Amino acid sequence: MVSVSEIRKAQRAEGPATILAIGTANPANCVEQSTYPDFYFRITNSEHKTELKQKFQRMCDKSMINRRYMYLTEEILKENPSVCEYMAPSLDARQDMVVVEVPRLGKEAAVKAIKEWGQPKSKITHLIFCTTSGVDMPGADYQLTKLLGLRPYVKRYMMYQQGCFAGGTVLRLAKDLAENNKGARVLVVCSEVTAVTFRGPSDTHLDSLVGQALFGDGAAALIVGSDPIPEIEKPIFEMVWTAQTIAPDSEGAIDGHLREAGLTFHLLKDVPAIVSKNIDKALVEAFQPLGISDYNSIFWIAHPGGPAILDQVEQKLALKPEKMKATREVLSEYGNMSSACVLFILDEMRRKSIQNGLKTTGEGLEWGVLFGFGPGLTIETVVLHSVAI
C-alpha cells in the first residue's frame, strides 16, 4: 500500500518554477504620445475645453511615454460615440469589443510563447488568464482554450478585475502550480485592452484624465514549469520566492469600479509616496534570507504605474538610474498596460541582456526582484534568479 506522503512526494516537482518562454503582442494601431492630446480632445468633441487640454498636454509631456498601442481606432470611436462621452452609459458597447479582443490579443502572445518554448501545445497542463478588461462567462480563459485548440481538460484559472499588481499575481500562482504538480507546464496570459477605460475628459475628475494619458493595450504570455527538459527547454528566469501584501493605511489609494459607463479608475496623488514608503519592508522580507541588502546589486522589474512611482522608489532606495532601464523602456514604448507590463519588462530584460553580451538573463546579475503595484494598495513581490546565457 502506498502512503499519502509517498503520493505527495511523487506529485511534486524537484526544482523551482522556471520561466521557459515569453511572447508579447499589441494591436496594430500605434498612437504617438506627442500628438495624442489633439486626437483625444477632437474625437471626444472636447476641443472647446482649452484649459483642460493644456493640462492634459502637460500630463502627456511628463508621462515619459513616447507611444502606446490601442485597439480603439478613430473609426471604432466614431461608431461608438457613447464611449467618447464622459460617464455616458456605454458598458454594452465596451463589452462587445473586449470579450472578443482580449482573448484574440492573448492568443497572439500565446502563439509566440509556445513557438519559443518549442514543445507541442498538447503538453500544456494549466492555463492562467488575467485581464482587467471586461467580464464574461464562460471567460476569456475558455475562449483562449478554443482559439489555441488546447485540450479540453487543461486546468483553467480565470482572474478578472485584479488591476496593475496582477502581473505579479500570475507569477505567484504559476509558481505554486508548477512546483506542486510534477511535469506541469503552465501557460500564463495577461491581456489588457483600454476599451473599458477610455472616455472623454472632465474638469472635475483629473484622476480619470491621468489614466487617459498613461494606459495602453498589450498582451503577454509565458510558459512556466519546473525541472526543464535538458537540451529541449531553455530556462529564462527561475522564480524563487513570492509574497503579496496590502500596504497599511492605503485604502482608497487606487480604486476601480465597473459601472454602466465602463471601468472607472480613481487614483490618489499620494500613490507614489505609499509605494516608496512600503518598498523597503518588502525588499528586506524578500532578500534578508539571501544576505542581500544592496539593492543596486540586483536587477529590477517594477510595474511602471507612472514615472512618479519609479522616481520615488529610485530616490528612496538610492538606486542607480540604470536599475530601472528596462522598466522605463517598456513604459516609454508601450505605456501602462496594467497586468501585462511586468511580463513585457521580463522580455525586454532578457533580450537586451543577450544583445549586450551579458553573462545572465538578468543584466549580468544573479538575483532580481519583480514588483506589482495596484488596487488595495496591493504589492506583489517576486524574487527571481537569472540564468546563464
From Swiss-Prot:
Say if the entry is tagged with keyword tRNA processing.
no
Q: Does the keyword tRNA processing apply?
A: no
A Pfam family per the record? Chal_sti_synt_C
Gene3D superfamilies xrefs: 3.40.47.10
Kindly state which reaction or reactions the protein catalyses. (E)-4-coumaroyl-CoA + 3 malonyl-CoA + 3 H(+) = 2',4,4',6'-tetrahydroxychalcone + 3 CO2 + 4 CoA
Concerning CDD domains, the annotation shows: CHS_like
Q: What is its EC number?
A: 2.3.1.74
Provide this UniProt record's keywords sorted from A to Z.
Acyltransferase, Flavonoid biosynthesis, Transferase
Question: What does the record give as the active site?
Answer: 164
Task: Give the similarity note.
Answer: Belongs to the thiolase-like superfamily. Chalcone/stilbene synthases family.
Q: What is this protein called?
A: Chalcone synthase 5
Recorded source organism is Pisum sativum (Garden pea)
Gene that this polypeptide is encoded by: CHS5
